[in-house]
Amino acid sequence: MTEQVQDENKLIAERRAKLDSIRPNCSANAHPNTFRRTHKAAELQEKYGQNTKEELEALGFRTSIAGRIMAKRGPFLVIQDVSGRIQAYAEKGVQADLKDRYQGLDIGDIIGVTGQLHLSGKGDLYVNMEEYQLLTKALRPLPEKFHGLTDQETRYRQRYVDLIVNEESRQAFVMRSKVVAAIRNFMIKKEFMEVETPMMHVIPGGASARPFITHHNALDMPMYLRIAPELYLKRLVVGGFERVFEINRNFRNEGLSPRHNPEFTMMEFYMAYADYKDLMDLTEELLSSIAIELLGSAQMPYGEHTVDFGGPYARLSMLEAIQKYNPDNATIQAMTYEQVKDLEFMRELAISLGIKIEKFWTCGQLLEEIFGETAEWQLMQPTFITGYPADISPLARRNDDNHFITDRFEFFIGGREVANGFSELNDAEDQDSRFKAQVDAKDAGDDEAMFYDADYITALEHGLPPTAGQGIGIDRLVMLFTNTHTIRDVILFPAMRPQA
């Protein structure tokens, strides 16, 4: 046991002893729930922070505040609530009473204070402790010196402590909430209807990914946590809801990384009588508007770069992007779609670039891997990548001029994918054959290939109007808006391996 752990255990024991000793003389077993706050810290700072000491004395304003003690500075207590911090002042008689009633207060304790608002000699607002009540005794101490929790793993495992002591973390999740609200409001103004579709699927579909499998006891059958809501949302378009969206969780049984969490949030939407170009225009409008609304500017810092959401955004085909970011590779510079269709050529090219290939990869998969290894990470500014091959886009409509590719794009910022959209495949027979090709791929060893969904084919046979649909990764978008570089910093409780 380390010295630090021993010290912490000693403090915990001392605090437990304090709580045990004060319980008999406190109401509600020392956990009262009768105190009512009248003002938050930020409200008082905003309304009275500019007043002079004399003005506040003359005003004689009384208030009730409540929050967690974050520091003790002589007779002053720094109290933190959801909005910010404010001080409370304990004159000598109050200090003696606190010691008598509660054996003194500790950092981390939650208290309620009622009294007159004053201004200190240093110009800080404070509430005189005329009435006060210990609301919750903190049995565990906050991190050393309260300069913030810096151990990354502890921050994620004990997010509650991280939020108490790290203002930056609190603000990141406030921004996340604002981003989601702004997206929702934008979609509603565009006449999209918010819907909810199943989280447990009989057949996993809507994306190429490995699902989580569970078991429904009453029905005695396996079920899958959804990897995407796509097929259910398109069923709604078949049913006549022409503009729908959903903000919810997806689950993919895959690895962890700075940009991947097995449980993540997506906003997915579908609009009838539109194509993938309309989606790109809508995405530009959405992102530029919420950036200006939330940050006051279409430009924002991201690491060493400045990302400009103002638009128009760059648009390149996947082949064009590979050629742009491999200027010195003569083979790539001369590459045509006819060569992209040549499996042996694509395998040799991938190997020459140091890419470890799988035997079941198609031409489209090889092209996507080459793009991912050589071009994707260089897409710092908002960029739409189009021209995705049909064999890696089983739900997307084929391009009218080049059937090898589809009317699909992925949207990149900061070197990572943030959104995926396409004109939907509404040809039931083509969808049937592509589902069958996915089944063949799964049989060949691709465990991320899709299942065959007969009911979805039946839905398409009733007629899906020309439709475009898109998914936007909320977590990755929030990473941009908060200038953070790991997805765990924007997910309140990220997936973690259990502690030994």
Swiss-Prot record:
Binds 3 Mg(2+) ions per subunit. GO terms for cellular component: cytosol. Pfam families: tRNA-synt_2, tRNA_anti-codon. It catalyses: tRNA(Lys) + L-lysine + ATP = L-lysyl-tRNA(Lys) + AMP + diphosphate. Its cofactor is Mg(2+). It comes from the Bacteria. It is an enzyme of class 6 (ligase). It is found in: Cytoplasm. Mg(2+) 2 binds at residue 417. Mg(2+) 1 binds at residues 410, 417. One of its GO terms (molecular function) is ATP binding. GO terms for biological process: lysyl-tRNA aminoacylation. Its main location: cytoplasm. PROSITE patterns: AA_TRNA_LIGASE_II. Keywords: Aminoacyl-tRNA synthetase, ATP-binding, Cytoplasm, Ligase, Magnesium, Metal-binding, Nucleotide-binding, Protein biosynthesis. Its EC number is 6.1.1.6. Belongs to the class-II aminoacyl-tRNA synthetase family. Homodimer. This is Lysine--tRNA ligase. It comes from Shewanella sp. (strain W3-18-1). The lineage of its organism: Bacteria, Pseudomonadati, Pseudomonadota, Gammaproteobacteria, Alteromonadales. The gene is lysS.
